[in-house]
Amino acid sequence: MGRTANEPLGRVALGKYLVTGVAGFIGRSIAAELLKRGESVRGIDSFITGKRTNLAGLEAMEFIEGDLADPAACVKVCDGVEIVFHEAALASVPRSVADPVGTNVNCVDATLNLLVAARDAGVRRVVYAGSSSVYGDTPTLPKTEEMLPNPISPYAVAKLAGEHYLRAFFRVYGLETVTLRYFNVFGPHQDPTSHYSGVLAIFCRKMLAGEQPTIYGDGEQSRDFTYIDNVVHANLLAAAAPSGKVAGQMMNMATGKRITLNDTFEVLRELTGYNGKPAYAPERAGDIRDSLADISLAEGLLGYKPIVDFREGLRRTVEWYRASGAE
């Protein structure tokens, strides 16, 4: 029997769990939960997109400032590590359209460097932050792992390349790898200030400040928004699951439900007290129309079930931004 996500993950002699992109939204959340459970954690971030303020509360973690595009940095952070949670990336479709080369360096090159270092250091398992963007704009819903990927943005191409590298390293070198294809993750600590931020973070900041948010397109596009606690839960399950069940696998990570951006705006209007209407602008290059995950594979392999639904997650998110002064 494997460990559950609520049990200690265990340690090798040197006892490190590495979180890449630890100053980012998802990486910070995973590290915080590991520390809460008494685990020994090492984190790395280059602060290209990560925020130093996100390291507050993680003082028990060993932190290394470095760039995974540098192979030497990867060697340093993988020493003595058993499990890697690889969250570092330039996680933005619009940014990848503006800077495809930078996206490739910080997603593909960085991932390959990390995998080589992990293999050489004897790391047991790498859990990878995949992306639903690899499915592209195919009309079939829900998205299943058996569907042929059809990436339509440089970011999606980069994340898919990472998936293939992970699977190759498992098959060729025996490095255990698990890919979780995230669907529109949101929650506390997500940066609401950048043009490249997630839509819910931007909406929360603007609506709490009484500013008009912008919907790109007609607003009838839909997303399977996934609250951060569900993603952290899934990562811990993926780290603890028996090798025979998950090594070399990739699976969707979402709630299995979708909502349009127009309906999302209405929920946020209720939660924030915003009285205006959204602005509408032309669709952005690289954006997909609809997104909905089939999560049955994660349910079967990990025992995963969403632990926080969309509306409750959005309520918690709004309250966090309100308390943190996002207005």
Show where each model-derived region lies:
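N-terminal Rossmann-like NAD(P)+-binding domain of SDR-like oxidoreductases, especially those catalyzing
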Residues: 1-185, 308, 324
